Amino acid sequence: MQIKRWFLNNSLRNYQYLLYDKSHAIVIDPLKSDIFAEFIAKNKLQLEAILITHKHGDHIAGVKKLLAIYPNAKVYAYTGNDLFKPDIYVKDGSFINLGFTSFRVMYIPGHIDDHVCFLFEQERALFCGDTLFNAGVGGVQAESADINQLYDSLVKITKLDGDIKPYPAHDYWLGNLDFALSILADDSYFNYYRNQVAELAAEDKPIVNLAEEAKLNIFIRAMSDKALLKALPDYSLGREMFVKLRQLKNNF
């Protein structure tokens, strides 16, 4: 299947994603229903599934309107919410075969306690919501957030094949790289990508695979990068370094 990406240019800098082939469509975390409905109608597709990574409003606001247009579409989510009840409740390890494609579910709490991601192995795509961003990770402001769970979820993602491409729900490239450079100012990867994305519109920013993400993401590098021991000598690599970096990012 092909993957269509839109940038909403709203205050939260949301990306929206749709998978499609000649006949079928799958929507991920719809905030704005109209862009999906227009594309689906224009290409004469059938909306088969709506996948929800978590229940924050900017990931579910468009679900009811899409279901009004496509009542046969099935909603997949870890838990329900005030706007809708899922047709299929997923959990860690769930495998869903839709016939025209399939996906696996990973439970990745930390940003919020109902967070999952959807791994499309044939497409080599991971829809990771607000857990992993380009050059960053999700925040821990939600009531059910847990910074240690977020670390464990990130470790879980890094164990996937390096050629899989993560598709995060927001464009936070610049802010995340600026933070990373405040810790490791001379790092070649941080500087390279900061210079590259600075001139690009959000719609044109790169979609990198997990192997590349591991080089440009300071939170992944917190697991093993000894350069961080010089920058933050009071903290050990792994969970302790990750927690410290997430705390510093909160106030950046």
Curated annotation (Swiss-Prot):
The keyword ATP-binding belongs to this UniProt entry's keyword annotation: no
InterPro entries: Clx_II_MBL, Glyoxalase_II_hydrolase, HAGH_C, Hydroxyacylglutathione_Hdrlase, Metallo-B-lactamas, RibonucZ/Hydroxyglut_hydro
Organism (species): Francisella tularensis subsp. holarctica (strain LVS)
Cofactor note: Binds 2 Zn(2+) ions per subunit.
GO biological process, one term: methylglyoxal catabolic process to D-lactate via S-lactoyl-glutathione
Name under which the protein is recorded: Hydroxyacylglutathione hydrolase
EC number, UniProt record: 3.1.2.6
Keyword Hydrolase: yes
Cofactor list: Zn(2+)
Cited HAMAP family: Glyoxalase_2
Subunit structure: Monomer.
Residues annotated to bind Zn(2+) 2: 58-59, 130, 170
Assigned protein family: Belongs to the metallo-beta-lactamase superfamily. Glyoxalase II family.
Main EC class the enzyme belongs to: hydrolase
A GO MF label: hydroxyacylglutathione hydrolase activity
One Pfam family here: Lactamase_B
Matches recorded under SMART domains: Lactamase_B
Signal peptide: none
Function: Thiolesterase that catalyzes the hydrolysis of S-D-lactoyl-glutathione to form glutathione and D-lactic acid.
Keywords: Hydrolase, Metal-binding, Zinc
Binding site for Zn(2+) 1: 54, 56, 111, 130
